[in-house]
Design a protein with these regions (language model features):
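Append "and occasionally in soluble cytosolic enzymes with long acidic Gly/Pro-rich linkers
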Residues: 1-108, 112
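Extracytoplasmic/peripheral linker and loop segments enriched in polar/acidic and small residues
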Residues: 4-5, 17-18, 55, 116-132, ...
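A short, structural micro-pattern
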Residues: 24-26, 137-140
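Positions that flank functional sites
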Residues: 35, 72, 125-126, 151
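Aromatic-residue hotspot detector
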Residues: 39, 84-85, 141-142, 161-166
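Short beta-strand segments
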Residues: 91, 145-146
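Short, glycine-/Ser/Thr-/acidic-enriched flexible segments
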Residues: 96-97, 148-152
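Ligand-binding pocket segment of bilobal, Venus flytrap-like solute-binding proteins
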Residues: 109, 142-145
Length: 176
C-alpha cells in the first residue's frame, strides 16, 4: 500500500486535467465524483507531491542507487521484493490521441520520481482482445489506462469485485 501511495504522490493528474481535459473537470481522488452523494470525503487523498512520493519510496526501501532520478530506483529491503529489483512498470493503453497524451504526462511524472515506465500503445483490437493473450482482459500489463463510464447514478462498484477479474471462468471479459 505504501508503494501505491508513493506512486499516487508522483502522478501529475492536474497536468492531465489541464492539458488533456482542458480544465473542465476536477482532479478525481476516487473513481466516484466528489459531487456524488456516495463520495467519502474522509478518505486520504494524494496530491501531486513528488518530494513526498520520493521520500516515501526511500522509506519503503526503493533506493535511488545512482542519485539520478531519471533512472529507476532499486529495491533494498523492500518487503517481499528481491534486492536489486528495479521499480519499473509497463504501461499499456490504446493508440487514441487522448490516451497517448495522458500516458506521456503520467509516465514523465513517474520517471521524475525514479519510477521506470515503458509505455505501449496498442491498437484497440489488440488492447481489448480476449484473454488470456489480450493486453487488458488477459491482464498482461503492470499499469493499464482505458475509459469507462456508467449511465446510472449508482457507482459501478461491482466492476471492482473479485468475480470481475478476467479469467477462463468468465471467458476473459471481467472488468476488474
Amino acid at each position: 500500500p505504501r508503494t501505491r501511495q508513493a506512486i499516487a504522490y508522483c502522478l501529475d493528474r492536474q497536468a492531465v486535467v489541464d492539458n488533456v481535459l482542458y480544465g473542465l473537470v476536477p482532479v478525481p481522488d476516487t473513481y466516484i465524483s466528489a459531487e456524488h452523494p456516495l463520495h467519502d470525503a474522509t478518505l486520504a487523498t494524494y496530491p501531486y507531491d513528488p518530494a513526498a512520493g520520493m521520500k516515501l519510496l526511500d522509506t519503503i526501501g526503493w533506493r535511488d542507487h545512482d542519485n539520478d532520478p531519471n533512472t529507476p530506483r532499486h529495491a533494498q529491503g523492500v518487503d517481499r521484493v528481491p534486492t536489486g529489483t528495479e521499480l519499473a512498470f509497463t504501461y499499456v493503453t490504446t493508440s487514441a490521441t487522448q490516451r497517448r497524451q495522458v500516458a506521456d504526462i503520467l509516465s514523465q511524472s513517474l520517471r521524475g520520481c525514479g519510477i521506470g515506465v515503458t509505455v505501449f500503445h496498442g491498437a484497440q483490437t489488440e488492447f481489448y482482445a480476449e484473454g488470456p493473450d489480450g493486453l487488458l482482459f488477459g491482464r498482461n500489463f503492470d499499469l493499464a489506462a482505458y475509459a469507462m463510464s456508467t449511465v446510472t447514478a449508482q457507482p459501478p462498484c461491482a466492476r471492482f469485485t473479485t468475480i470481475e477479474i478476467p479469467d477462463a471462468d468468465n471467458r476473459w471479459v471481467g472488468t476488474n
